[in-house]
Amino acid sequence: MTTETIAKVRPIVTGQRDRIFTDLKEITSFNSVQGVPELVEEHAHAAAWVKAAFESVGLTVTTYQEDTPAPLFIASKPAKGDAPTVLLYCHYDVVLAGDPSKWDSDPFTLTERNGRWYARGAADCKGNVVMHLAALRAVNELGGTDLGIKVLIEGSEEQGGAELSELIKARPELFAADIILIADTGNAAVGEPTLTTSLRGGAQITVQVDTLQNPVHSGSFGGAAPDATAALIRLIDSFRDEHGRVQIDGVDVDQKWSGAQYDPETFRKDAGVLDGVEIMGTSA
């Protein structure tokens, strides 16, 4: 983005401040926890709000997994000519707010304090839903774009995203794009806008260890009889050395991080590491 473009965009976005606050106030008013029977209607209201909101910025919204408790949406416009397509991601479900008495304000009433806005989901991830809407309104005000746009809005991210996983397997063509921007990460520090260019991957692996034909009594066989649970513990423990450094054959651990640095003391404070406890992987 050029300096000239930023100069054009900034006043448009700033001029939307009241609209952005209103949008965020509305969507955070829904206690849209997925998978809680007594909150099904709240989740459904949030889903309906999302669909209407993205239609209001000129995108065609298609609902998927309608027969599940957590429908997801793809709001889109086609690319013009050979223009690339951008896939944007966010989600409208939240986690439980916990004990309301521990909040400084009602978790479902957006509240401004010291220049920051507070409510359940204001950051993760309803603020990012509203951010996409504000950006799309700004694009429209600037005359539109030739880019193809797809916005994926998920309804069960906090519960593992089973509905999205199923759709990706069944309809991979829906997610075809030249670039993907996931609006569900964080900043390097408060007030420091951050672009995350890669994310940690994950894999779910089932490992089964068998050592005995049948369970036996520990009073008679304990000690000498090989314990499958103990074997699994030793297996997992072998992944790291005594300082927490990864030691798995084939995994390159010599790379140096070139992005924003995370001061160790700040990390300790943010993570709540107790005094006297080492940060994993840092000792020589």
Regions found by a protein language model. Give the residues of each.
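Active-site metal-coordination/substrate-binding segment of hydrolases
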Residues: 83-150
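Conserved active-site and cofactor/substrate-binding residues in soluble primary-metabolism enzymes
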Residues: 15, 19, 41, 45, ...
